[in-house]
Amino acid sequence: VYNEMKGAFSSPDDVVSREVMNGLYPDTTYGLESGGDPEVIPELTYEEFLKFHGKYYHPSNSLIYLYGNLDPEEYLTFLDEKYLSSYETLEVDSAIPLQKPFDEKRCVKREYSVMEDDIAENETYLTYNIAMGSSLDRELYIAMDVLVHVLCSDPGSPVKQALVDAGIGDEVYSYSETGIAQPYFSITAKNASSAQQEQFVSIIEEELQKIVKHGIDRKALLATLNEFEFRYREADFGSYPRGLMLGLQALDSWLYDKEKPFIHIEANDTLAVLKEKIETSYYEDLVQKYFIDNRHKAVVVVEPVPGLTGKKEEELADRLAAIKDRMTEEEKQAVVDATKALHAYQQEPSPKEDLAKIPLLKREDMKKEAAAYVNEERGSKEAPALYHNIFTNGIGYLNLVFDASHVPARLFPYIGILKSIFTLMVDTEHYSYSDLYNEIRIHTGGTKMVFNVYTNAKDMAKVKPTFEARTKFLFNQKDKAVELLEEILIHADFTDTKRLYEILAEYKSDMQATMQSAGHSLAAIRAMSYFSKSAAVTEQVNGIPQYRLLEELTKNFEDRKEELVANLKELCQYLFRPENLLLDYTAPEEGYAGIEEAVDRLRKKLYTGEIAKETYEPVTEKKNEGFLTAGQVQYVCRAGNFIREGLPYTGALRVLKVMMGYDYLWNQVRVVGGAYGCMCSFGRNGDAYFVSYRDPNLEKTIRTYEQAADYIAGCRLDEREVTQFIIGAVSELDTPMTPAVKGIYSLGGYMTGLSMERLQKERDELLAVTPEIIQGLGRQVAAFMRQDYICVVGNGNKLKESKELFMNMEQLFRS
């Protein structure tokens, strides 16, 4: 947990969110870090921990819900007999006291760390925050989110645009937190100057006054409520279980009133009421009451300090040294003995007789059949269509898949930029970008631009990159939905360079935040790009090369803006061509009628002019890099390809992945090493990696990776242990699929040529795993380890201590 929170405190965006809560609620539990402040965690005693846990993690302080097609009496009886009856009732006062509203707006200044040699100009976060209302107000719960979108978040929204036009920060974003007892609204200008604080506040407050005086855009209100209503009716939680997500939403009210668990789940009536109020002064009145007249506000300014992480580490070392100096020899020896006992406990496996008490499925209980594709080829050779006949509850899921294989190397990285432009919107031939955004949400459930890379299942050297334009809609809106996609893909106007710069700056800021919070993903894809064609292609659009291009374009925008516009126009001519397009559609048969005709109308307007086609071939070479950050932890990746060493992919590797994640890597990298997590992957194309997450170590972790093959070859698993790992592997394969996900899964099989026969063979191999088969898989691990591809993202000083590991080291974020 200590290293988890050191990692969390290394992300400036996380620091800002934390300080916002502290600024608004200084006298309540919301003003404290629930995960633990790493500067304070060393002060926690074991006795305090046990006392807290015994009081608050007691069933008397729990909320229990049931979900699914079940007999409540049966399950409640089981819970009572097997669990609750074992405890005495305990009176626990866990009610969250409310923060007394401020008499006047507060101003809070805090700091975050950047690299020691960072100039730290224009890297300040300016935030304006307002506490408002109660999470038990079912209308305000949704209306706050509506106002966030309409005023401060959507493309062209008035408060956001006013700040952008004034040049305050390179990204402006806002959100509302409605799931706490005292909800709040926050708007942030990222990468601003501290000197802009007063202007930042005055622009927001002046713009809010204008909004009340002149009124809110009714079409924007309708579009936002339509979007919320579509999302509510669709109830698509992706790979997350529906019952879990509904339970979490129930907590937004249930935690604060035990009689109101369902008020936010039953949102349909609330949405209808809010729609009826669009033509009234309801929303302007909310702005006046909560945004303008309300004094419970905090302006939180978080400024960069070069080398702050190092200074804090030195302060901690001095504190611990002082504590050590005050200890007697007996006290020191007691600490040494306790540490040895802890290490012994960490290495000691749980007794098998205890593990045997846990109920376990048997292999024969598990589904034998692989999940089937739902694919039907329709259309024609000139206008191919892939259809997934799946019940969707009245929603059509359309995916226009454009082959990007023939985009020249000089234009290929611009695919990522084009994707962000189509997501954040530019003006088109027939709409302003804000009007287009509203039209999309009024007539559809939204659009999404996706870059994918499909690896051929029969020839792993063949990859097909695609640009995919997706939308979803009610069946009677299919023509309008396709028309709006056409507007984006064909009629986009790239000549507004001011808007282009705004998008580039926001895209760069978003990438930076993602790279800081998901360093493990960054390190893994970078390490694999040294040898893997598919990873190298992906990295050009989603990885470090994309970020470097954004750095260059934003830094030298005036010199490069004409080149940027020309490249975007040329890229569209390579991508959006009739011969590149596959119509991919998910709906039941009654929703199919007319979709081919609608897409054919778009197809006829695609580019047909002559171009010099070439196949994009990325360069792969060993680089073994270290990327230096101001963070307090590392993300350590070691990668390679076992198929190149003559070893096959087998379904048993899915079982090994689970075993490594819950056994060897869990115990050695997390439990013993102190990292918050460690993951591994074994791809069908042979690409494999180990990567740690929020890791205090570097070389120690790499040594642990290097010993993995010997551990696997020597492990002695029993049938119960193997079955546990098989269950984990099956659960990953059999995650419930929504209709949209089932369609995308089926498309993946079609694009890669991965047959059902091969999928079934892999599942059979998975279910037939024995201890001996697991031992044999140590060869695959040894094979990819021998290739020694390494990438580490982490603390600059820590990486410099291990510089001999790297062929190159550079700062991840340049000034």
Q: How does the language model describe each region?
A:
Residues 68-72, 132-135, 188-196, 208, ...:
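A generic structural motif
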Residues 118-127, 135-137, 161, 368-413, ...:
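Active-site-adjacent "gating/activation" loops or surface patches in catalytic cores
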Residues 127-132, 152-191, 445-454, 639-641, ...:
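A structural supersecondary motif
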Residues 68, 224-389, 401, 512-618, ...:
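C-terminal regions of mature proteins
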Residues 1-52, 142-145, 149-162, 170-174, ...:
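Acidic/histidine-enriched segments that form metal/cofactor-coordinating
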Residues 139-151, 394-439, 483-486, 648-660, ...:
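Active/ligand-binding-proximal structured segments within catalytic/core domains
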Residues 3-21, 28, 39-44, 63-66, ...:
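Non-catalytic accessory/assembly modules
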